[in-house]
UniProtKB/Swiss-Prot annotation:
One or more lysine residues are methylated. One of its GO terms (biological process) is translation. The gene is rplK. Forms part of the ribosomal stalk which helps the ribosome interact with GTP-bound translation factors. InterPro entries: Ribosomal_uL11, Ribosomal_uL11_bac-typ, Ribosomal_uL11_C, Ribosomal_uL11_C_sf, Ribosomal_uL11_CS, Ribosomal_uL11_N, Ribosomal_uL11_N_sf. This is Large ribosomal subunit protein uL11. Part of the ribosomal stalk of the 50S ribosomal subunit. Interacts with L10 and the large rRNA to form the base of the stalk. L10 forms an elongated spine to which L12 dimers bind in a sequential fashion forming a multimeric L10(L12)X complex. It comes from Latilactobacillus sakei subsp. sakei (strain 23K) (Lactobacillus sakei subsp. sakei). One of its GO terms (cellular component) is cytosolic large ribosomal subunit. Keywords: Methylation, Ribonucleoprotein, Ribosomal protein, RNA-binding, rRNA-binding.
Amino acid sequence: MAKKVANIVKLQIPAGKATPAPPVGPALGQAGINIMGFTKDFNARTADQAGLLIPVVITVYEDRSFDFVTKTPPAAVLLKKAAGVQKGSGEPNTKKVATVTKAQVQEIAETKMQDLNAADVEAAMRMVEGTARSMGFTVEG
């Protein structure tokens, strides 16, 4: 018989840097998860993606066991990395802070494809371009 789901916890944690300290520890503690077990598993699974923010969905079962699924980093994080900037524009309609190429947008769209609700890479590219525009980035090409 399948285990009964008690809770679902969604977090965004830097890859390879999950620690029992806030904000990760308290969120997991409230759900009744073995914090050290989760942090070791998460850090091992995301060690190759250092420097990126990784969304994770943790499913907690009634017997306090858990499993988790890591997602691809948010498009905004990938765009900032591609453009080499710390943050987007405060006024995206008037102040453009960076430029990304179509090739960079396509690469990000292909990376994000498994998590996006898009039929093909073209649709995913349009989503990523929209995110770029809302951050004050110019898309060239």
